[in-house]
Amino acid sequence: NREKAVIIDALKGKYALPMLLSRFNMAKSSYYYQQAVMNKPDKYLSCREQITSIFQENRGVYGYRRIYLALKREGVILSEKIIRRIMKEEELTVLLSKKRKYSSYLGEITPEVENIVSRDFHADQPYEKLLTDITEFAIPSGKLYLSAMIDCFDGKVAGWTTGTRPNADLVNTMLDQVIANLPEGCHPVVHSDRGCHYRWPGWIDRMNEAGLIRSMSKKGCSPDNAACEGFFGRLKNEMFYGRSWEKVSLDDFRQEIDRYIIWYNHKRIKLSLGGLSPIEYRQHLGFAA
């Protein structure tokens, strides 16, 4: 009825009110009620501005639950129902989309490795279980590949690299980065799919030298690495899909990915972490970030 009243207000200078009410199937009492409501001062004006600001500052990816937690952190208590209504009125909509997954499986080239993780993505402390995978981005300037490693403890991106080719150097450089940041005496399980990158000598040698434990999904079984693929899905929904990448160079696009992951680790609210980001969660528990 509110939308109808707005349209009728816009047209009543040209057409008679009774005709408009009849055309929009709206009772006169309902119309005058909506007018009175719209003419009242907006008691949520400051909250409306705050919600819009939070939404825009966080890449337009926060739904009403994360907005609720972000407001709570700023000392503002507002019901989720009111937040949902304000977001609808302000047209603050999170865009979602899905694309096909990049696959690097080229057949068996080394002996089969046990699936130690076995879809148990829970970890009691940082660097206990790490998940890794590669995903592909295609923009007008070309293709870029992201290799990332996710910590099951809190979803933190423990390491990542980007490159124009999904080769051994891409994943090995990322693994070197993670190994360099491991706490002393830490030997996590590293779980991957059966992509060729994770069965080449360079990867296996690095794993063995660092005392890391290999775990691999079954062939063609996406749920076995669902937590890592889930991160890629969030990244693409929140950063990639729904935007125009015309005239964006691969270097600039690479920087966009870096900025997103830094924001994801340090700022992005996770509902499963009580409204904290992965870095904030570690600091809250007394772990090194």
Report each predicted region and the residues it spans.
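An active-site-proximal beta-strand-loop segment
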Residues: 119-158, 164-165
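Active-site beta-loop-alpha junctions of metal-dependent nucleic acid enzymes
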Residues: 138, 161-183
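Charged, often Cys/His-bearing segments associated with DNA-binding zinc-finger transcription factors
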Residues: 1-19, 23
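Basic, flexible linker segments flanking DNA-binding modules
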Residues: 2-5, 21, 28-125, 221, ...
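Conserved, non-catalytic sequence blocks in retroelement Pol enzymes and Pol-derived host proteins
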Residues: 40, 57, 77, 122, ...
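C-terminal domain-tail junction helix/linker
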Residues: 208-212, 236-289
